[in-house]
Amino acid sequence: MDELFLRMRALVAEKLEVEEASITLDSSFRGDLGADSLDTYELVYAIEEEMGITIPDEKANEFETVRDAYEFIKSKVT
């Protein structure tokens, strides 16, 4: 696991109040991790702050899995 995923996993665990070990790239934010729309908004904001990037609303709405968010973030920080 790379550093970016580990940072992102820690944020997801904190914001969604789940165990880090339960989060994989294939975890669904809503189905597996129990996120609702407010959780998703707070998570996107936390990622923007932590990573120093901006995630457009229309893009954030496309994040179904942790992988979706990870791939977008990776494209912005590398």
UniProtKB/Swiss-Prot annotation:
It holds the Pfam family PP-binding. InterPro entries: ACP (IPR003231), ACP-like_sf (IPR036736), PP-bd_ACP (IPR009081). Residues 2-77 form the Carrier domain. GO terms for biological process: lipid A biosynthetic process. SUPFAM superfamilies: ACP-like. The keyword DNA-binding does not apply. Its main location: cytoplasm. Keywords: Cytoplasm, Fatty acid biosynthesis, Fatty acid metabolism, Lipid biosynthesis, Lipid metabolism, Phosphopantetheine, Phosphoprotein. Belongs to the acyl carrier protein (ACP) family. This is Acyl carrier protein. The gene is acpP.
